[in-house]
Structure formats: structure tokens, C-alpha cells
Amino acid sequence: PLEQWMKTQEESAKILTEQFMNVTTIGGLIINLLLMALLPAIAEELTFRGVLQRLFEGKSLEDASLQNGSKAPYSLKARIPHLAIWCSAILFSAIHMQFYGFVPRMLMGALFGYMLVWTGSLWIPILMHFTNNAMAVLLYFVALRQGWDMEKVDAIGTNDTLWLGVVSMVITIIGIYAFRRSITMSNASSRMSN
């Protein structure tokens, strides 16, 4: 049945990830940062935010840009991008074939999509995606080198350490609010000066 297939996919992804992450040398860390942080950040953001989200918005790919100029090509007034953001976020999460983490990954994909809309720069979601993946790679690397119990490392943010997840979520929400507010104020001051 479907549930068994999902469990099998989840377990396969976990085994593959652990095989990649099971390094304790600086060279291995650098390779993992390239393969598991930098390349996915660039490739997935180009695909899901740079292409799919734009297609869902009905925009041509001709005006796609990695440059953050003073005038963003994305306008909340011109189009309502919410549907495009959420469609690309759902696909982003589904393509990872890790169903038990579907909702958090979908929310992260939506955050990346909104950051693209708010800033007009694909570099912001790429940087955020890289930072997220790099932090996981670095945590795993340090945990292995220090001999930490990997079961406890994997459980960070759940059960006994649920408070860490809550604190992280609150900090993230405050950061998003502050970032969005600064973008809005910056746009308002640029309109006033013109």
C-alpha cells in the first residue's frame, strides 16, 4: 500500500543521506557542502522558484534575473503570487520523496518563494537554501567528530528538545516580519523620493 511505499522511500532517503554525511575529514566536509548544500540550493531554487514559480505566475522566463537591481521584476500589486508560491512549494517538498518531513519542507519552500517575490532576487532564496542545508551538514559533521549520539542529534527539536523548535520558529517568524517590514519601508521611501 501507499503507506508502506512512503516508509520505504523515507528509509531509503535516510540511508543515502547518512552514507553521504558519514565523514569526519575536512575534505569530506567540503565535498558534502558542495554536494548537499551549494549544488541543491542553486539547482532547486533555479528550478522551483526561477522556473516553476514564474510559470505558475504566468510570467515569461525572458525577464528572469539573478541580479538584485533597484527595481524588482516581481510586484504583489501586478499579480497575486500566492498560488504560484504554494504550488511550487508543494512540488519542491514532494520531489524530495521524504513524506514525513513534507509539511516543514513545503513551508520552507513557500518561505523561499515569498522571499523571491519580496526581494525580486533569486539569490536570496538560494542563500537561504544553502544556509539551511549547510547548517545540517555542519551539525552532522561536528556531531560525528565529537562522538555525539546521532539518535539524539536527529531528535533535536522533538520530544525533550521541542522548545528548541518552538524558539527557532518564533525567531524565524520575527525575522521574516522584520525583513518584510524593512522591504516595505524601503519601497515606500523609494516611491516618495521619485
Describe each region flagged by the PLM:
Residues I31-F56, I173-S182:
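Transmembrane alpha-helical segments in integral membrane proteins
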Residues T25-I31, F102-P104, I156-L162:
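Juxtamembrane helix-entry segments on the extracytoplasmic side of multipass membrane proteins
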Residues P1-M6, G50, R54, G58-K59, ...:
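Membrane-interface elements of multi-pass transporters and channels
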Residues P1-P40, G58-P73, K77-I80, S189, ...:
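Juxtamembrane helix-loop-helix connectors linking adjacent transmembrane helices
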Residues W86-G157:
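Functionally important transmembrane alpha-helices
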Residues F130-N194:
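C-terminal membrane module of polytopic membrane proteins
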Residues A43-C87, Y114-S121:
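Membrane-interface helix/loop boundary segments of multi-pass membrane proteins
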